C-alpha cells in the first residue's frame, strides 16, 4: 500500500521522517511521567515521606515531560500533515493527467459520482496513512516495545501477565477486519450508487420539475440513500461487538497483572516496588498500543481505496505518439475506420443476507462492445468544407470525435496530411483542430478567461476581437462587466446559443487549420443563426472544415456532403449530385424542408 503512494511523496519524504522522530520523542515524554509517579509512590510503600525537594523536582519533571510531549507531538503532526497534503496534491495532479490521457468512454463509464469520490473522498483518506498511521504508528509501536523490554528486565513474570491481554484484543481486531473486508466491495458499490444518484438528481432538477417527476426521482434518490444507510448499519452491526472487545481490553494491560501480581507480592515472590513499576509501565503504554492497532482497523479501507485509485490511474491510456505535427498538408483521410462503444452489461446479482436486502446488492458485470462505425473510408481535402449528415445514431458525431482522438479506433486509421493521429502527441493534435460541439462547457470563471482557453498566450485585444467576430457583442453589452462577467456554474448565466457563440470565439481565437463544427448552430434562432453562419464563413477560409448539421439548408453550399446511415457512408457528393442520385439524401432533405416550414 505504502509502495503505491511513495512515488508521490517526493521531496517531502524527509518531512515524514522528521514527523516520525518528533512523535516518537513525544510518546517517550508522555510515558516518562509514569516513572516519576512511581518514584513518588515508592517511598510511601516503605512507610516513608519523600523529601519536599524530591517531590517538587518530580512534579516539575512531570509537567516538563507533558509540555515537551505536547510541543514535540504537535510539531511532528505539523510536519506529517505538510508531507501528507503535498502528497495528496501530487496524487490529484497525476490522476488529472492520467484521466486526460484516457479515452472519453472510460471517463463516462466511471460516472461523475465515482470520479468525484476518488478525487476528493478517497484521496483525502490517504491523509490518514501519511499524516497519522506512519508517524504515529511507528511511535506508538516503538515506545511500547522499549517499555515491554524494560518490563522483562524488572520481572519476566509480570511482563508476561501484562502482555497476556493483548492477544485477546488482537484477535478481536482481526475478526473485525475479516468481517469488514468481506463486505468492503459491496459497501463501496453502495456508496458509489448513492453518489451517482445524488449527482443525477441535482443535475436533473430542471427536468424533474418540468415533467413532475419529483416522486419517481426522489424515490430513486431515497432508495439509494436508504440502501447505503441500511448496508452501513448492517456492516457495523457485524463489526461493533469485536470493536467493543478490543477497545475495552487493549488499554487494560493490568487486567491480569494487578490481581496475580498482588498474590505474588503477598507470597513474597516479588517485591511490591517491582509490581508498582510494572503497573505504571502498563498504564503508560495501553493507550499507545490501542492507538497503533487502531490504524490496523482502517488499513483494509485504505487498501480498497488505493486499489480503486490505482485502477483509475492504470486505466488504458489513449494511444498517442511523441511527435509533433509533421503532415505535409491538412488533408484528412479516414481509412477502414471501425469503432465500437464499450458498455458494461450487468450479469446476475450475488445473493445477500436478509440484513442486506434493502441495501445495494453486489453484482458482477461484463464488457460488451457495440460497433457503430463499419469500415469508414473518407478523404477530406485541405481548404474544403465537408458536411456529415444522417439520421440520429448514424455515426456523424462519433466520426468527428474520433478525429479529435476522444477514443481509440478498433481498427483502421485516421491521418492528417499523411500523418497518423496516433503518431502525434495529444497536445500536437489539439493544436491542429478547433472543435465546436453542440453542448459546450463553460468554466465558472469570466467569459474572457473562457475564450482565452482557445489560445492562452493571446492578448486582450485578440480575445475581444474573437468575441466580436463570434457575434458576442450583443449579449456582452447587457452585462455591467461585459466580457469580464462570470459565466456561472457550467455557463448557466448564458443561454444555449450564447454559450455556443463563446465556444465559437474560442475556435476563432485558436485559429487552427482544421475546424470541426458539431451542430454548432443548434441552439440559434434564425436571426442569430444567420450571424453565426456569417462568422463561421469568415473563419473557415482556407481551412479543412467538417460540419455536422441536421438543418440541411445550412450545408447546401458545402464542397462535399457525406450521407451516413447505420455506421456506413452510403453516398457522397455535392448537394446537386445527391439530390439526383441518393434516395436517402432526398428523404433527409424533404424532412428538413418540411421541418423548416412547420408552424404552430
Predicted feature descriptions by range:
Residues 1-30, 50-57, 76-80, 84, ...:
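Membrane-integrated ABC transporters
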Residues 10-14, 104-105, 121-130, 134, ...:
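An intracellular "coupling" helix at the cytosolic face of ABC transporter transmembrane type-1 domains
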Residues 11, 15-28, 69, 135-186, ...:
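Transmembrane helices of ABC transporter permease
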Residues 16-72, 153-157, 272:
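Transmembrane helix-loop-helix hairpins at lipid-water interfaces of multipass membrane proteins
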Residues 29-38, 65-112, 116, 120, ...:
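Juxtamembrane helix-loop junctions of ABC transporter transmembrane domains
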Residues 85, 93-117, 121-123, 197-220, ...:
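Short intracellular "coupling" helices and adjacent cytoplasmic loop segments at the cytosolic face
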Residues 328-600:
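ABC-type nucleotide-binding domain
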Amino acid at each position: 500500500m505504502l509502495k503505491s503512494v511513495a512515488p508521490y511523496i517526493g521531496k517531502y519524504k524527509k518531512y515524514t521522517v522528521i514527523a516520525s522522530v518528533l512523535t516518537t520523542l513525544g510518546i517517550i515524554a508522555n510515558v516518562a511521567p509514569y516513572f516519576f509517579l512511581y518514584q513518588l509512590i515508592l517511598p510511601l510503600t516503605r512507610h516513608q515521606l519523600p523529601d519536599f525537594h524530591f517531590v517538587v523536582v518530580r512534579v516539575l519533571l512531570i509537567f516538563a515531560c507533558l509540555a515537551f510531549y505536547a510541543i514535540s507531538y504537535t510539531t511532528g503532526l505539523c510536519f506529517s500533515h505538510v508531507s501528507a497534503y503535498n502528497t495528496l496534491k501530487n496524487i490529484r495532479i497525476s490522476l488529472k493527467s492520467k484521466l486526460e490521457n484516457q479515452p472519453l468512454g472510460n471517463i463516462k463509464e466511471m460516472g461523475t459520482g465515482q470520479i468525484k469520490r476518488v478525487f476528493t473522498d478517497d484521496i483525502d483518506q490517504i491523509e490518514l496513512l501519511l499524516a497519522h498511521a506512519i508517524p504515529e504508528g511507528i511511535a506508538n509501536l516503538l515506545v511500547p516495545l522499549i517499555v515491554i523490554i524494560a518490563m522483562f528486565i524488572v520481572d519476566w513474570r509480570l511482563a508476561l501477565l501484562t502482555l497476556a491481554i493483548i492477544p485477546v484484543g488482537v484477535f478481536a481486531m482481526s475478526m473485525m477486519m475479516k468481517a469488514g473486508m468481506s463486505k468492503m466491495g459491496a459497501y463501496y458499490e453502495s456508496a458509489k450508487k448513492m453518489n451517482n444518484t445524488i449527482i443525477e438528481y441535482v443535475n436533473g432538477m430542471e427536468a424533474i420539475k418540468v415533467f413532475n417527476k419529483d416522486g419517481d426521482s426522489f424515490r430513486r434518490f431515497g432508495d439509494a440513500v436508504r440502501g447505503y444507510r441500511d448496508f452501513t448499519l448492517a456492516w457495523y452491526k457485524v463489526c461493533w461487538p469485536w470493536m467493543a472487545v478490543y477497545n475495552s481490553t487493549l488499554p487494560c494491560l493490568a487486567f491480569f497483572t494487578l490481581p496475580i501480581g498482588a498474590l505474588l507480592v503477598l507470597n513474597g515472590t516479588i517485591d511490591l516496588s517491582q509490581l508498582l513499576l510494572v503497573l505504571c509501565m502498563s498504564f503508560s503504554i495501553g493507550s499507545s498500543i490501542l492507538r497503533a492497532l487502531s490504524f490496523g482497523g482502517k488499513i483494509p479501507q485504505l487498501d480498497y481505496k488505493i486499489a480503486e485509485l490505482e485502477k483509475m490511474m492504470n486505466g488504458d491510456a489513449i494511444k498517442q505518439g511523441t511527435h509533433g505535427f509533421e503532415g505535409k498538408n491538412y488533408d484528412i483521410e479516414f481509412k477502414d475506420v471501425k469503432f465500437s462503444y464499450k458498455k458494461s452489461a450487468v450479469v446476475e446479482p450475488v445473493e445477500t443476507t436478509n440484513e442486506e436486502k434493502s441495501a445495494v446488492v453486489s453484482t458482477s458485470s461484463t464488457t460488451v462492445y457495440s460497433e457503430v462505425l463499419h469500415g469508414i473510408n473518407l478523404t477530406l481535402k485541405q481548404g474544403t468544407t465537408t458536411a456529415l449528415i444522417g439520421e440520429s445514431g448514424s455515426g456523424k458525431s462519433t466520426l468527428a470525435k474520433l478525429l479529435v482522438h476522444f477514443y481509440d479506433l478498433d481498427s483502421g486509421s485516421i491521418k492528417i496530411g499523411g500523418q497518423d493521429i496516433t503518431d502525434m502527441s495529444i497536445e500536437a493534435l489539439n493544436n491542429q483542430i478547433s472543435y465546436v460541439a453542440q453542448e459546450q462547457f463553460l468554466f465558472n470563471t469570466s467569459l474572457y478567461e473562457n475564450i482565452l482557453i482557445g489560445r492562452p498566450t493571446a492578448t486582450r485585444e485578440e480575445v475581444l476581437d474573437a468575441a466580436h467576430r463570434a457575434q458576442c457583442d450583443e449579449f456582452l453589452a447587457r452585462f455591467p462587466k461585459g466580457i469580464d462577467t462570470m459565466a456561472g456554474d457550467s455557463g448557466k448565466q448564458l443561454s444555449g446559443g450564447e454559450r455556443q457563440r463563446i465556444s465559437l470565439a474560442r475556435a476563432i481565437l485558436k485559429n487552427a487549420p482544421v475546424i470541426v463544427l458539431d451542430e454548432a448552430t443548434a441552439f440559434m434562432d434564425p436571426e442569430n443563426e444567420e450571424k453565426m453562419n456569417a462568422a463561421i464563413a469568415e473563419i473557415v477560409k482556407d481551412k479543412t472544415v467538417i460540419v455536422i448539421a441536421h438543418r440541411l439548408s445550412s450545408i447546401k453550399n458545402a464542397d462535399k456532403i457525406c450521407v451516413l446511415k447505420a455506421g456506413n457512408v452510403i453516398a457522397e457528393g455535392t448537394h446537386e449530385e445527391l439530390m439526383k442520385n441518393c434516395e436517402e439524401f432526398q428523404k433527409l432533405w424533404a424532412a428538413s424542408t418540411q421541418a423548416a416550414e412547420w408552424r404552430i
